[in-house]
Amino acid sequence: MFFQAGAIIILLLFYGCYFGKMFLQKKKGIQTDQIGKGKTGRSKAIELIMKVATIFVPLTEMLSIYTNYSILSGMLRYAGSVIATAGDIVLVISVLTMKDSWRAGVSETDKTELVTDGIYQISRNPAFGGFNLVYIGILLMFFNWIFFMKSCKVVYISIK
Protein backbone atom coordinates (compact mmCIF):
# COMPACT_ATOMS: atom_id res chain seq x y z
CA MET A 1 0.00 0.00 0.00
CA PHE A 2 2.93 2.37 0.74
CA PHE A 3 4.25 2.09 -2.80
CA GLN A 4 0.82 2.51 -4.36
CA ALA A 5 -0.01 5.65 -2.36
CA GLY A 6 3.45 7.10 -2.94
CA ALA A 7 3.30 6.45 -6.68
CA ILE A 8 -0.13 8.05 -6.99
CA ILE A 9 1.10 11.18 -5.17
CA ILE A 10 4.22 11.29 -7.37
CA LEU A 11 2.15 10.99 -10.56
CA LEU A 12 -0.44 13.53 -9.41
CA LEU A 13 2.33 16.06 -8.81
CA PHE A 14 4.05 15.16 -12.09
CA TYR A 15 0.99 15.40 -14.33
CA GLY A 16 -0.46 18.24 -12.26
CA CYS A 17 2.68 20.29 -12.92
CA TYR A 18 2.70 19.42 -16.63
CA PHE A 19 -0.98 20.00 -17.38
CA GLY A 20 -1.29 22.83 -14.84
CA LYS A 21 1.47 24.76 -16.63
CA MET A 22 -0.22 24.11 -19.99
CA PHE A 23 -3.53 25.41 -18.61
CA LEU A 24 -1.97 28.56 -17.11
CA GLN A 25 -0.14 29.34 -20.33
CA LYS A 26 -3.27 28.75 -22.42
CA LYS A 27 -5.05 31.37 -20.29
CA LYS A 28 -2.30 33.80 -21.38
CA GLY A 29 -2.77 32.84 -25.05
CA ILE A 30 0.39 30.71 -25.16
CA GLN A 31 0.19 27.39 -27.04
CA THR A 32 2.39 25.13 -24.91
CA ASP A 33 1.94 21.86 -26.81
CA GLN A 34 4.16 22.20 -29.88
CA ILE A 35 4.92 18.49 -30.24
CA GLY A 36 4.80 17.50 -33.92
CA LYS A 37 3.52 20.90 -35.06
CA GLY A 38 5.26 22.49 -38.04
CA LYS A 39 7.58 19.51 -38.40
CA THR A 40 8.07 17.16 -41.35
CA GLY A 41 9.72 13.83 -41.98
CA ARG A 42 11.72 12.10 -39.27
CA SER A 43 11.36 14.94 -36.73
CA LYS A 44 7.58 14.87 -36.99
CA ALA A 45 7.50 11.06 -36.74
CA ILE A 46 9.69 11.03 -33.62
CA GLU A 47 7.63 13.74 -31.93
CA LEU A 48 4.33 12.02 -32.76
CA ILE A 49 5.63 8.68 -31.40
CA MET A 50 6.64 10.54 -28.24
CA LYS A 51 3.18 12.10 -27.99
CA VAL A 52 1.48 8.69 -28.32
CA ALA A 53 3.88 7.24 -25.73
CA THR A 54 2.96 10.00 -23.28
CA ILE A 55 -0.61 8.72 -23.46
CA PHE A 56 0.13 5.00 -23.16
CA VAL A 57 2.85 5.13 -20.49
CA PRO A 58 0.53 6.67 -17.85
CA LEU A 59 -2.03 3.94 -18.58
CA THR A 60 0.66 1.30 -18.08
CA GLU A 61 1.85 3.09 -14.93
CA MET A 62 -1.67 3.14 -13.46
CA LEU A 63 -2.22 -0.55 -14.26
CA SER A 64 1.12 -1.40 -12.65
CA ILE A 65 0.27 0.67 -9.57
CA TYR A 66 -3.18 -0.92 -9.33
CA THR A 67 -1.76 -4.47 -9.40
CA ASN A 68 1.05 -3.47 -6.98
CA TYR A 69 3.19 -6.17 -8.55
CA SER A 70 6.96 -6.03 -8.78
CA ILE A 71 9.62 -8.69 -9.25
CA LEU A 72 12.18 -6.43 -7.58
CA SER A 73 13.21 -6.33 -3.93
CA GLY A 74 11.80 -3.87 -1.42
CA MET A 75 15.12 -1.99 -1.41
CA LEU A 76 14.92 -1.33 -5.16
CA ARG A 77 11.28 -0.31 -4.83
CA TYR A 78 12.26 2.25 -2.15
CA ALA A 79 15.07 3.48 -4.40
CA GLY A 80 12.47 3.88 -7.16
CA SER A 81 10.31 6.05 -4.93
CA VAL A 82 13.30 8.31 -4.18
CA ILE A 83 14.23 8.52 -7.88
CA ALA A 84 10.64 9.32 -8.93
CA THR A 85 10.36 11.98 -6.23
CA ALA A 86 13.62 13.51 -7.48
CA GLY A 87 12.07 13.54 -10.96
CA ASP A 88 9.09 15.51 -9.68
CA ILE A 89 11.41 18.02 -8.03
CA VAL A 90 13.49 18.43 -11.21
CA LEU A 91 10.36 18.90 -13.34
CA VAL A 92 8.82 21.48 -11.00
CA ILE A 93 12.08 23.44 -10.77
CA SER A 94 12.46 23.26 -14.58
CA VAL A 95 8.96 24.56 -15.25
CA LEU A 96 9.24 27.34 -12.66
CA THR A 97 12.65 28.44 -13.94
CA MET A 98 11.50 28.44 -17.58
CA LYS A 99 8.51 30.70 -16.76
CA ASP A 100 6.51 31.53 -19.92
CA SER A 101 9.25 30.28 -22.25
CA TRP A 102 8.32 26.68 -21.39
CA ARG A 103 7.00 24.55 -24.27
CA ALA A 104 6.38 20.87 -24.96
CA GLY A 105 8.19 20.71 -28.28
CA VAL A 106 9.85 23.53 -30.21
CA SER A 107 7.80 26.25 -31.84
CA GLU A 108 9.05 27.65 -35.13
CA THR A 109 6.96 30.81 -34.72
CA ASP A 110 7.07 31.67 -30.99
CA LYS A 111 10.09 33.72 -30.04
CA THR A 112 10.97 32.97 -26.45
CA GLU A 113 13.88 33.94 -24.27
CA LEU A 114 16.67 31.37 -23.94
CA VAL A 115 16.82 30.42 -20.26
CA THR A 116 20.35 29.76 -19.02
CA ASP A 117 20.09 30.34 -15.28
CA GLY A 118 19.07 28.09 -12.40
CA ILE A 119 18.76 24.41 -13.27
CA TYR A 120 19.35 25.30 -16.94
CA GLN A 121 23.01 25.98 -16.07
CA ILE A 122 23.33 22.24 -15.41
CA SER A 123 21.22 20.78 -18.24
CA ARG A 124 19.85 22.13 -21.50
CA ASN A 125 16.55 20.29 -20.97
CA PRO A 126 16.14 19.32 -17.32
CA ALA A 127 12.38 18.73 -17.78
CA PHE A 128 13.20 15.63 -19.87
CA GLY A 129 15.56 14.58 -17.10
CA GLY A 130 12.66 14.93 -14.66
CA PHE A 131 10.38 12.90 -16.96
CA ASN A 132 13.00 10.15 -17.21
CA LEU A 133 13.60 10.06 -13.45
CA VAL A 134 9.85 9.70 -12.80
CA TYR A 135 9.47 6.94 -15.42
CA ILE A 136 12.54 5.06 -14.13
CA GLY A 137 11.47 5.48 -10.50
CA ILE A 138 7.92 4.22 -11.08
CA LEU A 139 9.38 1.36 -13.14
CA LEU A 140 11.56 0.31 -10.19
CA MET A 141 8.60 0.56 -7.82
CA PHE A 142 6.35 -1.67 -9.98
CA PHE A 143 8.71 -3.58 -12.24
CA ASN A 144 7.15 -5.78 -14.90
CA TRP A 145 8.42 -6.52 -18.39
CA ILE A 146 5.64 -4.72 -20.30
CA PHE A 147 6.16 -1.54 -18.31
CA PHE A 148 9.93 -1.96 -18.73
CA MET A 149 9.69 -2.07 -22.54
CA LYS A 150 7.39 0.98 -22.69
CA SER A 151 9.61 2.96 -20.31
CA CYS A 152 12.74 2.10 -22.30
CA LYS A 153 11.05 3.31 -25.48
CA VAL A 154 10.08 6.65 -23.93
CA VAL A 155 13.50 7.21 -22.35
CA TYR A 156 15.24 6.27 -25.62
CA ILE A 157 13.11 8.66 -27.70
CA SER A 158 13.58 11.53 -25.24
CA ILE A 159 17.36 11.09 -25.16
CA LYS A 160 17.68 10.73 -28.92
Label every PLM stretch briefly.
Residues 1-109, 113, 134-160:
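Membrane-anchoring alpha-helices and their flanking helix-loop junctions
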